[in-house]
């Protein structure tokens, strides 16, 4: 292939069954106008389309500061309980409300717009997730889109009616789950759910609430500003989604910090919540990015179903409300560690999804890797996902690699033969001066938080706040009725020495797989090590943290999330334990609350230091230097 940029036109003849697609394509910018398969090889962040700004870059700062909500007790802010876990917020016309944290929101009067989607007042509670590690979308007051505006206020709060009647929009904000307290285990992420130096109101302690109102622009919080270009494309794609009688498959391609996940989140929200009367149609979300997943467990890929009535708004850090249909454990945040394992898992997941013959809308979230092996991942995903819509996100119009090959047409059971619609959008500009507080929220730290949240999750969607070393582990046997096989992805099982297996497992995160039958194993001590893991049919169920192993009793003690442990207890299966490269959060091995009073008490951690000159001496032979001669 030459280095010329591949171009595609939207008016090429296609299958007769795709008449509606040809009509809608006229609304899109085609690649005959803008090249889409290009030679991207840079990190220029000077674009200015959709901005994830810090507070100092808030658009129209003077105007917005006047519109930014600031609470005043007994005027536009009312507490509903002695515990202050519920508050009423009154907004004037077009006023912006910025909230960090995890909370539930009910629109008592009027309406709101959130990410350019309108929501009417009603008794429904919406679940919001606004961590400070991501740009926060403002909640903007709006009107009631209906014949007659109503006041959706419970009986016990009717005495507030006269105090709130003069406001255009009235909201009830209540506490969410206690995930905001979980950051206390990770000191470097202690302000992940909002700046610590901001107090809500006099008399209300920060620990009383799972959310925090931002009443003053700060460089500790980024604000999401959606560009006109993005809004136009999102609206046009929503029309296609609403009017299509066939399936729709969306794939977004972009590098790191390109806004790929943000755009897909906005599209999902627009598709599911555009109408005030929520439909029962769900969206399928295929998440094959093990490093920064949207829905998958840590270092895994998954196929999920997102329902419009229960969908979580904002960045839920894989803790929102959704249904997982299928998942595969990768064992690493990078597909490059075991490329064959990753490719096989992706292909298996997409094939299982294809058999569903889903006629709705599906999204594919791929890694933000557009060079080297990342190009192979993109091409592999294109071949198997067969998208109807492909969006390229580039910085300042910089081209992508010419090795990304988009087929001229795809063929599926649902659509026969069709030509993909290809769009190119600009990525958001990244602030050149990011505050020290925001610099801590890198991908590795967020992965550690997700692993911690996963392991601490309870059945009722709350979280265990104390370190796991202070909890009682669950007991599982090693043998025919428990764990029937061990697999180590990093090492060859045949090269393992049985005395080293216990040490290599203590205090590590492992994956539990359900096996259909007893695998072919080789016993090394008490450990049944798999001979050929790829030949046995297993199903990934979830992650666990190993507390300890009793070699004499052939028992293994593990911390298993409460919601997962109930499922394991209800079924009698054979289990295979897989160890990858997943790192255990340091807060699980050595909590910062001072529970270990002396060095002797600390498990998993060796404080031994070699004495001076205590090391292995290696004699160097035949080292030839200038002036040296062999005799």
Swiss-Prot record:
Binding-site positions, ATP: 254-261
Keyword Signal (UniProt): no
Molecular function terms from GO: ATP binding; polynucleotide 5'-hydroxyl-kinase activity
Lineage: Eukaryota, Fungi, Dikarya, Ascomycota, Saccharomycotina
Primary location class: nucleus
Name of protein: Polynucleotide 5'-hydroxyl-kinase GRC3
Task performed by this protein: Polynucleotide 5'-kinase involved in rRNA processing.
Record key words, sorted: ATP-binding, Kinase, Nucleotide-binding, Nucleus, rRNA processing, Transferase
One Pfam short name: CLP1_P
Family indicated by similarity: Belongs to the Clp1 family. NOL9/GRC3 subfamily.
Gene of this entry: GRC3
Protein location: Nucleus, Nucleolus
Coiled-coil intervals: none
Enzyme Commission (EC) number: 2.7.1.-
Highest taxon above the source species: Eukaryota
Positions of region (Disordered): 1-65
Biased composition (Basic and acidic residues): 19-30
Uppermost EC category: transferase
GO cellular component annotations of the record: nucleolus
Source organism: Kluyveromyces lactis (strain ATCC 8585 / CBS 2359 / DSM 70799 / NBRC 1267 / NRRL Y-1140 / WM37) (Yeast)
Any one of the GO BP annotations: rRNA processing
